């Protein structure tokens, strides 16, 4: 699987069509939105499903927990949760950006998730 850094580098900041913000309840076939391809020609990087990465969810250098919600991320820096990138059909438009990180445990069954292999 790709690392979180590799997927982020491949992302596009464009506002081209994708499947998020409940625009569809179901994923669409890969390649359905060619206008949303990154500058590297990689398609379907935002929307249609969170993409699993091989990167454990961990704090960035200088991380400080939010005063109003300290357990939001820190409780999940346990080596059992992995970074997910992109967005799913159920992701709100405000959260859709190349730098947003989500996280889940690999065996969690209730997430719109996809994965991508790279050489």
Predicted regions and their residues:
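Functional-site microenvironments in short loops/helix caps that host divalent-cation chemistry
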Residues: 4-98, 109
């Amino acid at each position: 699987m790709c690392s979180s850094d590799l997927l982020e580098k491949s992302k596009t900041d464009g506002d081209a069509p994708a499947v998020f913000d409940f625009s569809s309840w179901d994923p669409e076939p890969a390649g359905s939105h060619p206008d949303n391809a990154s500058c590297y020609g990689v398609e379907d990087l935002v929307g249609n499903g969170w993409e699993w990465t091989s990167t454990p969810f961990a704090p960035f250098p200088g991380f400080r927990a939010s005063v109003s919600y300290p357990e939001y991320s820190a409780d999940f820096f346990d080596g059992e949760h992995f970074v997910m990138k992109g967005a799913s059909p159920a992701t709100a438009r405000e959260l859709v950006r190349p730098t947003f990180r989500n996280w889940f445990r690999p065996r969690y069954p209730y997430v719109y998730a996809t994965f991508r292999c790279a050489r």
